[in-house]
Amino acid sequence: MLNTAREIIDVCNERGIKIYDLVLEEEIKNSHTTEEEIRKKLDAVIDVMHASATKNLTQSDVTEYKMIDGFAKRTYEYANSGKSIVGDFLAKAMAMAFSTSEVNASMGKIVAAPTAGSSGIMPAMLVAATEKYNFDRTTIQNGFLTSIGIGQVITKYATFAGAEGGCQAECGSASAMAAAALVEMLGGTVEQALHAASITIINVLGLVCDPIAGLVQYPCTFRNASGVINAFISADLALAGVESLVPFDEVVIAMGEVGNSMIEALRETGLGGLAGSKTGQKIRRDFLKEGD
């Protein structure tokens, strides 16, 4: 397992390799398989991501509680209208994040990368960026492998679980993984990939997990949409030469410490934050009544 970001940088620079090379070597060793087989499995995962990110752009899944239905379709239509403030590329990326969130909420097939609650971020980044830059499959696979390396460092120091570390741990981690993957796919350095991951987490440090009625829908879907934007802007900054003063290892340690300091009501219990609002509590009561 890749232990620290510092170790990753040192080994990659010493050997003249990239993060995805290290991840591949480790997977081949641990799973006793071949690179060809690993890349074949990655293709299957990427296909599921593409399907979830695009499914609801022109239709709407119907979820049981209808809290987020139609967000993807509306945002996609707006992105194509030429009126978007942030431009059609970022607006479409948000629509793609919404799409996967809707698929998840309607019990469809998604890839938890790294969690179901943050499952819209990586697919939206991969699909939107591929449409823009026309990445080939190997480049996409290498980006995905890079994200795995970032995730391994996060799990060493912190957690992916909102119930342990808040939404910073879920969407923050997903965004960091996506940002590093994008830097790799665009030809950035190992250091730039890690700076992008650091900046991404810094942007959401302290973000709480407060799902209304305990359902992974609202406000989760907005945090997936903003999460993919976070990944894009953080990758942009890193590729521009902007560096994180605090190295990635320390950023993740800080995220873990912040998560540990959060009160229980703000860690996926459905009690605090928006879940504790009057509207949130009413929805929760209605939800519990339906379950009786």
UniProtKB/Swiss-Prot annotation:
GO BP, sorted A to Z: gluconeogenesis
Cofactor binding notes: Binds 1 [4Fe-4S] cluster.
GO molecular function ontology, one term from the record: metal ion binding
Cofactor: [4Fe-4S] cluster
Pathway: Carbohydrate biosynthesis; gluconeogenesis
Disulfide bond residue pairs: none
Subunit relationships: Heterooctamer of four alpha chains and four beta chains.
Protein name in UniProt: L-serine dehydratase, alpha chain
Organism in which the protein naturally occurs: Peptoniphilus asaccharolyticus (Peptostreptococcus asaccharolyticus)
Gene behind this protein: sdhA
